[in-house]
Swiss-Prot record:
<dbReference type="GO" id="GO:0016787">
    <property type="term" value="F:hydrolase activity"/>
</dbReference>
<feature type="site" description="Transition state stabilizer">
    <location>
        <position position="186"/>
    </location>
</feature>
<feature type="modified residue" description="Phosphothreonine">
    <location>
        <position position="152"/>
    </location>
</feature>
<dbReference type="GO" id="GO:0004082">
    <property type="term" value="F:bisphosphoglycerate mutase activity"/>
</dbReference>
<protein>
    <recommendedName>
        <fullName>Phosphoglycerate mutase 2</fullName>
        <ecNumber>5.4.2.11</ecNumber>
        <ecNumber>5.4.2.4</ecNumber>
    </recommendedName>
</protein>
<feature type="binding site">
    <location>
        <begin position="23"/>
        <end position="24"/>
    </location>
    <ligand>
        <name>substrate</name>
    </ligand>
</feature>
<dbReference type="Pfam" id="PF00300">
    <property type="entry name" value="His_Phos_1"/>
</dbReference>
<feature type="modified residue" description="Phosphoserine">
    <location>
        <position position="118"/>
    </location>
</feature>
<feature type="binding site">
    <location>
        <position position="100"/>
    </location>
    <ligand>
        <name>substrate</name>
    </ligand>
</feature>
<feature type="modified residue" description="Phosphotyrosine">
    <location>
        <position position="133"/>
    </location>
</feature>
<dbReference type="InterPro" id="IPR005952">
    <property type="entry name" value="Phosphogly_mut1"/>
</dbReference>
<feature type="binding site">
    <location>
        <position position="62"/>
    </location>
    <ligand>
        <name>substrate</name>
    </ligand>
</feature>
<feature type="modified residue" description="Phosphoserine">
    <location>
        <position position="14"/>
    </location>
</feature>
<keyword id="KW-0324">Glycolysis</keyword>
<feature type="binding site">
    <location>
        <begin position="187"/>
        <end position="188"/>
    </location>
    <ligand>
        <name>substrate</name>
    </ligand>
</feature>
<feature type="modified residue" description="Phosphothreonine">
    <location>
        <position position="3"/>
    </location>
</feature>
<feature type="active site" description="Tele-phosphohistidine intermediate">
    <location>
        <position position="11"/>
    </location>
</feature>
Length: 253
C-alpha cells in the first residue's frame, strides 16, 4: 500500500548539454530549450495537482533554476528549499568541458561509455592546470567542505556514496514524517537515489537514462520501498524520445 509520494526531476537541458560537453560541477546555465522543459515540468505538476512541503536541490544553477521555474509555475515559491553539494552532478574531472562526441571519436565510444556509465571507474582527475579548476575547486560555495570531501573526479559509485548519506539523514526522515518532497537535481545524483529505492544492480543503473525536465513520480510504502514502477509526468512519446536522446550522448557523430 502506498503511503508516500516522491517527485524528482532532472534539470532542464543546459547550455553544455546542448553543446554535448561533459558538464559535471561546471555551473552551466539552462539553455532556451531547458528553460522550456522546466516550464513544461511545472505545467505537468500543476495539471497533476501536486503540492509539496519541502524541496531539495544541488548548488548548481541549472538544477536550482529548474526548481524555481517549477515552484513559480505551480504557485509554491514560498516553500522551503534545501541546497546541497551532495546532490550535485557527478564530477567528470579532466573530461569537464570536453565535447562528448569528439572525445568518443578520439578514445572510442566504449571508453567514453565506461567513463560515463561504468559504476566504479572514474574519469581522469581534474588537475590544477585544468581550465575550469579554479572556477570549481576554489569556488566559495564549496569553502565549507571538510578535507577530502571536495572531489577532483568521481565514478557513479563515488557520486552515490556522497549523495546517499544526505538521502538517509535528511530526505528520507522528512518523507517518513509525511512531508511531500520534490527533488530537482542531476542525472547521476538522481540515479543514485533510484538505485537505492529499487535495489538495482550496478549494471542495471548504468543503463538507466533519465530524461531532462520530465518529472519522475514514485509511490512508496512506509519503508520507502516503491509500490509501483516509477512513472513520468508527460506523454509516452515525449518520454521515449527524451530517454533516447540521453542514451545517444556518448556516441561519435
Amino acid at each position: 500500500m502506498s503511503t508516500h509520494r516522491l517527485v524528482m526531476v532532472r534539470h532542464g537541458e543546459s547550455t553544455w548539454n546542448q553543446e554535448n560537453r561533459f558538464c559535471g560541477w561546471f555551473d552551466a546555465e539552462l539553455s532556451e530549450k531547458g528553460a522550456e522543459e522546466a516550464k513544461k515540468a511545472a505545467q505537468a505538476i500543476k495539471d497533476a495537482k501536486m503540492e509539496f512541503d519541502i524541496c531539495y536541490t544541488s548548488v548548481l544553477k541549472r538544477a536550482i533554476r529548474t526548481l524555481w521555474t517549477i515552484l513559480d509555475g505551480t504557485d509554491q515559491m514560498w516553500l522551503p528549499v534545501v541546497r546541497t553539494w551532495r546532490l550535485n552532478e557527478r564530477h567528470y574531472g579532466g573530461l569537464t568541458g570536453l565535447n562528448k562526441a569528439e572525445t568518443a571519436a578520439k578514445h572510442g565510444e566504449e571508453q567514453v561509455k565506461i567513463w560515463r556509465r561504468s559504476f566504479d571507474i572514474p574519469p581522469p582527475p581534474m588537475d590544477e592546470k585544468h581550465p575550469y579548476y579554479k572556477s570549481i575547486s576554489k569556488e566559495r560555495r564549496y569553502a565549507g567542505l571538510k578535507a577530502g570531501e571536495l572531489p577532483t573526479c568521481e565514478s557513479l559509485k563515488d557520486t552515490i556514496a556522497r549523495a546517499l548519506p544526505f538521502w538517509n539523514d535528511e530526505i528520507a526522515p522528512q518523507i517518513k514524517a509525511g512531508k511531500r518532497v520534490l527533488i530537482a537535481a542531476h542525472g547521476n545524483s538522481l540515479r543514485g537515489i533510484v538505485k537505492h529505492l529499487e535495489g538495482m544492480s550496478d549494471q542495471a543503473i548504468m543503463e538507466l537514462n533519465l530524461p531532462t525536465g520530465i518529472p519522475i513520480v514514485y509511490e512508496l510504502d512506509q519503508a520507502l520501498k516503491p509500490t509501483k514502477p516509477m512513472r513520468f509526468l508527460g506523454d509516452e512519446e515525449t518520454v521515449r524520445k527524451a530517454m533516447e536522446a540521453v542514451a545517444a550522448q556518448g556516441k561519435a557523430k
